[in-house]
Every structure is written in structure tokens, then in C-alpha cells.
Amino acid sequence: MNHHLIITPIFHLQIMLPVATLKRPPPPAATCSIYSFSRGTPSLVSKARLSTAAVGGMKNEPSPNHYSDISSSDLNLTRRSGNYGPTMWDFEYIQSIHNDYTEKKYMNRLNKLKEEMKKMIMAEGSQELEKLELIDNLQRLGVSYHFKHEIMQILSSIKQHSTPADSLYATALKFRLFREYGFHISQEIFGGLSETHTEDTKGMLYLYEASFLATEGESELEKARNWTEKHLREYLENKNDDQNVAELVHHALELPLHWRMLRIEARWFINFYKKKQDMIPLLLELAILDFNIVQAAHIEDLKYVARWWKETCLAENLPFARDRLVENFFWTIGVNFLPQYGYFRRIETKVNALVTTIDDVYDVFGTMDELQCFTHAFQRWNIDELDNLPDNMKMCYFALDNFINEVAGDAFEEHRVPILSYLRNAWTDLCKAYLREAKWYFSKYIPTMEEYMDNAWISISAPVILVHAYFLVANPVNKEVLHYLENYHDIIRWSALILRLANDLGTSSEELKRGDVPKSIQCYMNEKKVSEEEARQHIRLLISETWKKLNEAHNVAAHPFPKMFVKCAMNLARMAQCMYQHGDGHGHGDLNSETTNHIMALLFESIPPA
């Protein structure tokens, strides 16, 4: 299906579909219902959620009395501007999209291909390496979720009967797949194998990819990553005959597979797989058809959240805030693309949209007095705190209050577990973290790295996102897990930290131009008296080290969370790497950005049949 871009005078992005597939139903009426709010039951749980440092400050931070002197009368009441551009995505166009892959005939064909593929996967006589390569292809093509039982059966059999491989490539592939699927495997499997295969480019590539599944203390994998990267870069600098291997090497050095957003990787690998000499036509047809069917499901989710967003009228009434509904939806595909989780994507898109809006209230709109009152309203969940606030800030409060009561009501109906207090606590923590950053801004205070990091992993909003995610994927909701959830288990903390650091690498320059509070790069520069490039290198190292911690948290068999929740936490970190790899992929709304290209490829451009 070919698509052509046309830019309208108001910078809306439109895609011209073939006339036969384009249907334009009248868009639904957008009625602002924001003041028709429900007042939820007050939380019965009251407890300190943030650390003492996050609430009261570190020893070098200005005292609360210092902040109390900052009043509206002391400030220039001219509101700041984030200088955000308008949304590129047209509401009527989104509602008009018709995707043929919703038709039953495509699902029937997919089911037939799946049955044929299962027979191929479980065929007798295949060698161990052939089975591992097939699993790898299934995974990178984005269709392994259809064959979870078969894959686990094969890997379990290999685990029980496997003999040491004499190939660096086979050993590295086995290591990566075992770790990805939760099987214990030691770094000792490589022994001295790696040092003797410097001419094996494919083996070095797969060892390089495997090294990113290391946990803390696995020094041999760290060494392997360093020397394989050196050899792979030298390989690209020299002329080579195998263009497929060169393309894989370039792709890996740009961003390792373990850090990549799954759906973008699937789209890229489908195009790569077409060119392989050993390509399996059945598997290629399955991957393309599955991609297009899943894309059709995502479009229906996007239509739903676009209607919701228009009905809130937040974009019209808060023009200072980023109107990034499609980008907010894109995040949810990265966290959980599976077609059966449409409710997850719809709710998490609302979370993302509200986070973005409230973040901009704190960053570019509110005065110190207003933000204090705004935060108190969220701490007490009491509308009386809103009396002296501008109407658009009241709208934010009502929109969020409506939303979390809706989510809590749905969860209680399904699980008979009251979750309102957990949702409220997570949002309160976020607003308190935003307020602390606002205090730093208004007092022109540059926090230490420790002060900044203590607050920033919460202000990046990952805890809010993942608290909601648990209630959206857990079935049943386990009351014993809620303690780990509300205290932000390491799985949440490390995912949040990667999101924060990746965000800082991609956005700090632009945010400083707007006058925002310093980010980790500037805090480190100020504290250590180093250059910006040295600070950026330090942040990249922190990201790498945090991935090791997240890998460890993922691998610990004793963690209390369902596998799907852990995958969501891992995928949120991957999505951060994707969104901020080439700058601010969330806030800019740039037509030519990588984010726009990714959104086009995942949502609006079907893959033609092979």
C-alpha cells in the first residue's frame, strides 16, 4: 500500500490512501465534559511516599523558608512559553482511516499460516543451531508471541540435552535467547572461546548483542562488549563482501538489539529478512500479514483515544501545553503492542497525555503560589484547594480525577480490588516531584547530582505509568504484590532511571533554552567541573549500568510480578532509548524527525505482500 505525504498550510500531516480504501465518516461531536466530574472516595491510606530527600531536600538545598519567600508578587507574571509547535496529526483524518486488514479473511489466512509454522517449528530432525536461528527469526520478526509454548518447549529441551557449541556464533545466540526467555545460563559458557574467534565477524556480532544481557559483576561480558565493539567498528571501516552482515553490524552498533523497541525492530527486520538467501517464504508471509493485522488493531485504539482527547478540550484550553496525542499513543505500542491489549493502550495513552499536560503546567505555566495550591489539591484530592487557581489548571485536576476514578471503577468491577488509593498515591508522588523541580527553578538552584537523581526518576513519570500498567495486565490482581508496587520495586525504579537518563540526553539542551531546571548533564557538569561531552559520557555509562540492574531484576525468579508486567517495564526502558535516541522525539513534533518516521511506519503504512 503506497502512501504520499501532503503538508497542509496548518502543518497537519495527512496521508493519501488509495480511494478504494478511504472512507470519511463524519467526526463525532466533541463536547467538553470536563466539568462533569465524579468525586471519588478519599484514600484511606495516608503515608509518606517519597524519601526525606525528595520531599524535604538534601542538606545543601535551600530551606523551605527560602521557598516561602517566593510569592507571585515577587515574580514576573508573564507566563512562560515552551515554544511547542502544533500537533501534526489531523483528528478528522485519523477518524477516517480504513484498514482492510480488519477483514476476517486476513485473520483466517493468519491462523492457517500459524498452524503450518507450528509444524515447522516442532519438526523432528532439526539441528540445535537451526532451532535457535528459527526462534531468533520469529522473535525479531515480531511473531514469537504466537509460538510461546513451542519456543519454551524447544529451549527447555536444549537446556536439558545441549552439548557445548564449538562456534562463537552458536554459543552467543544460545546465551542471548536463554536469558531473554528466563533460563539460567552463566557467562562462563564462553570460556576462552571469544578470544580465539576474532576473524568470525558474525560470532563477534552475536557476542556483542549477547553482552547487553549482562548483570552486575559479569566482568567477562563487559570485556567482551568492549573488544567486540572495537573489532566490529574496524570491520565497517574496511571494505567487506557480505552486505547483509555489514547491515546487521551497523544496526547493532547504532543501538543494541536488547535496547530496541520491539515493533520498530520487527518492521526493520521484515525488510532485512526479505533479502536473506535462507529466507523462509512461509515465515515472511506470516510476519507481514501479522504486522498489518496488528497495525489495524492499533489504528482502532488510536481512533478511540483521539476522540477522548478531543472531548477533554485540554488542547484548546491549555495552548501552552504539548498537544502530542499520537506520540503519546506511540509510547504505548512500545510498551505493549500485543493486539489483545487494546484496553491497556487506551488507558496508558490517557496516562501519557495527562502526564504531558500536567508536566507543562509545572514547567511553563504555573507560578510558585499556583503550583503549591495545585500540588496540595492532589495531595488531599480536595477541590476546595482549587478556588484561587486559573480555570485551565482546574481543568487538569478534573480531567485527572475523572480518569483515575474511571480506571479504579473498571478494576473493581473486574477484580473486586479497590485500587483508587494506589493510583492517587502515584499521581501525588509525581506532582510532588514536579513541585520540587519548580522550586529549584524559581530559586535558581542547581541541585547536586544526588539531589537531582533522587527526584528525577519519579518526575519522569515512569512510576505512574507502571503502577497503572500493573492493574491493566495483572489477572488476577494479587493483593500481596501491592506492597511491592506502592514502594516501587527495583523493576520500576531501574526502568524509570533509564527513561530519565535517556530523556536527559535527548532533551536537556532544548529544555535549558526554555529556562527549565538543570538536568543530570548540567548537574554533573556543575558538580564535577567537567565539559558537556564528559558529562554526556557519564550519563551514557549510567544508562548501561542501570540496564544491568534491570536485567538482574528481570532475571530474579523471586520477584512477585507477572511476566507481562515485567515485560512492560523492560519495554518502557526500550521505548525511552527509541524516543530520545535522536533528540526530543516526544516534544518537538517535527515532521522530519525519527519519531514521525517511526509513527508513519508503525501506524499508517502497511507492508505490501511479498
From Swiss-Prot:
Gene3D superfamilies: Farnesyl Diphosphate Synthase, Terpene synthase, N-terminal domain
EC number annotated for this UniProt entry: 4.2.3.108, 4.2.3.106, 4.2.3.-, 4.2.3.111
Pfam families according to UniProt: Terpene_synth, Terpene_synth_C
Upregulating conditions: In petals, transcripts, protein and enzyme activity levels follow a circadian oscillation, with an increase during afternoon to reach a maxima in darkness and exhibit lower levels in the morning, thus leading to a nocturnal emission of floral monoterpenes.
Chain sites annotated for binding Mg(2+) 3: 503, 507, 511
Residues the entry annotates as binding Mg(2+) 1: 359, 363
Cofactor note: Binds 3 Mg(2+) or Mn(2+) ions per subunit.
Broad class of where this protein is predominantly found: plastid
Subcellular location(s) per record: Plastid, Chloroplast
Catalysed reaction, written as an equation: (2E)-geranyl diphosphate + H2O = 1,8-cineole + diphosphate; (2E)-geranyl diphosphate = limonene + diphosphate; (2E)-geranyl diphosphate = sabinene + diphosphate; (2E)-geranyl diphosphate = (E)-beta-ocimene + diphosphate
Pathway: Secondary metabolite biosynthesis; terpenoid biosynthesis
Entry similarity comment: Belongs to the terpene synthase family. Tpsb subfamily.
Listed PANTHER family: OS04G0344100 PROTEIN-RELATED, TERPENE SYNTHASE 10
Domain-related comment: The Asp-Asp-Xaa-Xaa-Asp/Glu (DDXXD/E) motif is important for the catalytic activity, presumably through binding to Mg(2+).
Stated role: Monoterpene synthase involved in the biosynthesis of monoterpene natural products of the 'cineole cassette', volatile compounds present in floral scent. Catalyzes the conversion of (2E)-geranyl diphosphate (GPP) into 1,8-cineole and, as minor products, limonene, sabinene, (E)-beta-ocimene, beta-myrcene, alpha-pinene and alpha-terpineol.
Record's protein name: 1,8-cineol synthase, chloroplastic
Species, as recorded: Nicotiana suaveolens (Australian tobacco)
Gene: CIN
